[in-house]
Amino acid sequence: NEKEVCLSMALKLGALIKERYPDIKIIYTRSTDVFVELAERANIANRNNADLFICIHANAGSTTAYGSETYVLGLHRTDAQQKVAERENASIALEDDKGAKYRSYDLTPDGIIALQFQLAVFHRQSILFAEMIQKEFKRIGRYDRGVKQAGFLVLYKTTMPSVLIETAFLPNPTEEKLIGTAEGQQKMALA
């Protein structure tokens, strides 16, 4: 189950960071298996004046897809990026108000100008961090699918450098086995 695997990896990553850098304050959007709305995930980081937002996911796709990729906020530039953003943003349907709070997420020409302004503030820092993540995935033997851009709502709402990490492809049995074990999750967290 993606949400349980990703929660486990996030908690393992947080513990590793705390162990290596005890002065860093770790703030989780959730520490138990509960659903947190997309806007609230970003709001938690914003309210706590976070310096960095990391969102951990497991990818969907074909049973033969493999590797790790990291996303930063960007405009939908291709059909493939649009589909990925739609899939990640689909959890809006699970929210009580079915997305009424996201009406400000606007990709009209005016919305795009506003989004470009927001992108300029933290975009470069997000890309640099995403590149470091991908380098670490490569170091542990993961196939590097690269740093990509998409209009994920959870990244759009943050006011700090932010990344969404797609750790592995759940439909691929080998990838599912990797992140489905405590050992595999620890390996991913160490990256």
Regions found by a protein language model. Give the residues of each.
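Catalytic-core regions of hydrolytic enzymes
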Residues: 1-104, 119-131, 186
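Flexible hinge/switch segments at interdomain interfaces of large molecular machines
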Residues: 101-109, 164
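Active-site-adjacent mobile loop/cap segments within catalytic or ligand-binding domains
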Residues: 58, 111-191
